[in-house]
């Protein structure tokens, strides 16, 4: 872990990206809380001097005070003096950077305050103390500790949950990092609402009323703005410089070949054989061969496109240095990042990374493919040739990560000056694509001033807050009509059998009839049939969809059913005159048991009042009353009357669980629709909207107006209604 990668410096980066107004509001809010070291006057002269030196360019002049001398880079000399800016005598203007030390000081105070109040950390508090105010002091103190004590401190902070073997530097880094995270989180909770809203506007996040959720969102967004020092270090280490010198090429013994031997085909009709020879395609004379190429950067004339192809003395290829281009999309050439050049007719190709890519230039330019990646610091002679090869399949293994010894760039440009810039740009793009750093999650939201419970950095992830406090679980019961539609489409009946699918739905009192069980007897035929049983209002109806579509036969069969029902009278589901196979009888019992999920064991409702209670007193001992046992709960959720009418629970029962989740998990849509019908509430086809209607009705006590149109009657129901209207008209 490098010395510059102090967690405080990394974590303070997002604060520097906030607006000056937000930082000013934060400092003012901290001043109102009277946290130590939060006033502008507390900014020491040394901190002001450091800020001024950071803003001062390297070439600015400095003054001498007390015999102190400074270099041109504003660094102190060995005599231990101090430096001052030329403008130090002018009145100090508070700018954005002056607020950062104040905020950082408060964060450290909160960090150490949290550190010394961790449960069971008396020994750790004695080791660290409470007077440390700078990040370097904690690092220095931790390095003095015995390895055993350091490990004990690391364990007390809860940072060893998933770490088996970790060195001392990593332990110290994680301790500092966790402290800073805790400090920032506690500071956010002490800021006022106005400051937090300003933070949200700068970070472009949604303002929330929940304080914990708002601070967690700010922490998550600020973490994403942190920049890892590893990225800049790698980029600086892998930057190449192009130099052009007029010298004789080095001896052949110091070069290695990296040319692939794959057979290549040019974009023109010319075919390049799989040999070490190269084909030159240029419109003007290239640069003389006496100009060597440094750091594997190709330099060409204004209208010449050249690819570096180093060869050894024997003219053979080095097998260990062979590189395969990456696979491009069929018909679409893969473009590498390039820098805009002045308007010329020569192509500019720039390839970044270790694995070379294929770039196709406009039709008037020559197509160039970069296929070499020599090691760093190997000087290869420039060749006046252009290698054109089609894209081949990418290697099965992924390309290795960029390192200091392997990260080189091969660039083909038109001028020497632009080559260096393009090379640096391409390598910076390559390094930014690498993983940023290890994840560090947010902290637990504090419910009070008690210390937070730390967990392991790098292994945690922020947990998103639920949008709704009521967690709605998916309905486990089958939705009405869903089983029949699905089974009817997937059934595969044989020529001599009939496929039967059973679906359970809630009864509706509007279409209840006296018959308890009706069955359409199907004759075995060679035609395919699909039969669907639907339980509605306690009465089984069989709906047949015959391929011939004979509606008259269905009407005749339905009339026969009614005559049979009239002769048999009201019957129980358990005793039916239908002759069916044993599997259908078993399904009958299953359907009867399904009612027990909603009903009670008697017909009087166990104290629940309904519209038909007065009429049901004489029918309590009737043998035709169905007995449905409640298996899910001892509480009454509704029941059926003797005429198969479903009675929904009363208001008192629903008020027990007025939450949306209670209605969602314990009632089907048909239950809720029946409830809406009894209390003259609007009906809706979706369960969510129906629940909302019921909840609004229970809270307000008034039923909204009916907006839906009355259902249009069809078939026998329409004829019956018409007959009743005629009779009423005749009687009047």
UniProtKB/Swiss-Prot annotation:
**What residue spans carry the Basic residues bias annotation?**
327-338
Q: Which segments carry the region annotation Disordered?
A: 38-90, 226-629
Q: Where is the composition biased (Low complexity)?
A: 47-56, 77-89, 231-247, 254-318, 339-383, 401-421, 487-523, 567-577, 593-609
Report biased composition (Polar residues) as residue ranges.
57-76
Give me the stretches of Acidic residues compositional bias: 553-566, 610-621
Q: What is this protein called?
A: Uncharacterized protein DDB_G0290587
The major lineage groups are:
Eukaryota, Amoebozoa, Evosea, Eumycetozoa, Dictyostelia
């Amino acid at each position: 872990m490098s010395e510059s990668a102090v967690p405080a410096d990394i974590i303070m980066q997002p604060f520097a990206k906030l607006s000056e107004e937000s930082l000013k509001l934060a400092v003012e809010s901290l001043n109102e809380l009277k946290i130590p070291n939060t006033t502008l006057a507390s900014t020491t002269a040394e901190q002001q001097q450091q800020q001024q030196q950071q803003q001062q360019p390297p070439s600015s002049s400095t003054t001498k005070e007390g015999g102190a001398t400074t270099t041109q880079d504003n660094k102190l000399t060995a005599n231990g003096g101090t430096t001052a800016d030329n403008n130090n005598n002018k009145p100090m203007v508070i700018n954005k950077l002056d607020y950062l030390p104040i905020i950082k000081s408060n964060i450290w105070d909160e960090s150490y305050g949290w550190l010394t109040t961790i449960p069971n950390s008396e020994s750790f508090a004695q080791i660290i103390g409470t007077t440390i105010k700078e990040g370097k002091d904690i690092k220095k103190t931790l390095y003095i500790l015995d390895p055993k004590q350091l490990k004990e401190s690391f364990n007390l902070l809860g940072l060893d949950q998933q770490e088996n073997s970790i060195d001392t530097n990593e332990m110290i880094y994680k301790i500092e990092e966790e402290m800073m995270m805790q400090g920032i989180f506690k500071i956010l909770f002490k800021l006022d609402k106005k400051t937090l809203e300003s933070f949200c506007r700068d970070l472009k996040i949604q303002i929330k009323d929940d304080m914990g959720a708002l601070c967690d969102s700010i922490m998550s967004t600020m973490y994403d703005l942190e920049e890892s020092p590893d990225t800049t270090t790698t980029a600086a280490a892998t930057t190449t410089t192009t130099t052009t010198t007029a010298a004789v090429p080095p001896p052949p013994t110091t070069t290695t070949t990296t040319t692939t031997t794959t057979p290549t085909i040019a974009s023109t009709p010319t075919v390049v054989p799989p040999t070490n020879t190269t084909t030159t395609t240029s419109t003007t004379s290239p640069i003389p061969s006496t100009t060597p190429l440094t750091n594997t950067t190709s330099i060409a004339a204004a209208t010449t496109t050249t690819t570096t192809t180093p060869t050894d003395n024997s003219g053979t290829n080095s097998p260990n240095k062979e590189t395969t281009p990456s696979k491009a999309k069929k018909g679409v050439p893969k473009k590498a990042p390039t820098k805009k050049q002045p308007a010329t007719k020569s192509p500019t190709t720039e390839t970044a990374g270790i694995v070379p890519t294929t770039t196709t230039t406009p039709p008037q330019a020559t197509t160039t493919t970069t296929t070499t990646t020599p090691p760093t610091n190997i000087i290869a002679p420039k060749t006046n040739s252009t290698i054109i090869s089609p894209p081949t399949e990418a290697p099965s293994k992924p390309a290795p990560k960029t390192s200091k010894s392997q990260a080189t760039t091969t660039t083909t440009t038109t001028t020497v000056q632009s080559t260096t810039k393009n090379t640096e740009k391409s390598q910076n793009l390559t390094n930014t694509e690498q993983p940023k750093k290890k994840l560090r999650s947010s902290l637990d939201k504090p419910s009070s001033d008690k210390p937070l419970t730390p967990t392991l950095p790098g292994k945690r992830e922020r947990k998103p807050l639920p949008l709704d406090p009521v967690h709605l679980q998916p309905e486990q019961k089958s939705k009405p009509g869903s089983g029949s539609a699905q089974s009817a489409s997937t059934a595969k009946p044989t020529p001599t059998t009939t496929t039967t699918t059973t679906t359970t739905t809630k009864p509706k009192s509007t279409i209840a009839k006296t018959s308890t069980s009706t069955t359409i007897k199907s004759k075995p035929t060679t035609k395919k049939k699909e039969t669907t049983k639907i339980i509605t209002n306690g009465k089984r109806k069989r709906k047949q969809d015959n391929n011939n579509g004979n509606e008259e036969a269905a009407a005749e069969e339905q009339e026969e059913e009614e005559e049979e029902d009239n002769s048999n009278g009201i019957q129980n589901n358990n005793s039916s005159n239908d002759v069916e196979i044993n599997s259908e009888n078993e399904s009958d019992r299953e359907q009867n048991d399904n009612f027990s999920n909603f009903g009670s064991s008697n017909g009087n409702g166990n104290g629940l009042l309904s519209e038909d209670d007065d009429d049901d007193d004489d029918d309590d001992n009737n043998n035709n009353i169905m007995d449905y046992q409640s298996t899910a709960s001892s509480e009454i959720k509704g029941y059926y009357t003797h005429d198969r009418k479903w009675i929904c629970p009363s208001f008192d029962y629903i008020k027990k669980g007025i939450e949306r989740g209670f209605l969602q998990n314990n009632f089907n849509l048909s239950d809720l629709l029946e409830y809406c019908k009894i209390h003259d509430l609007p009906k809706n086809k979706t369960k969510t909207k129906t629940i909302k209607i019921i909840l609004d009705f229970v809270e307000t006590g008034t039923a909204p107006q009916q907006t839906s149109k009355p259902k249009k009657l069809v078939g026998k129901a329409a004829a019956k209604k018409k007959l009743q209207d005629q009779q009423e008209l005749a009687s009047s």
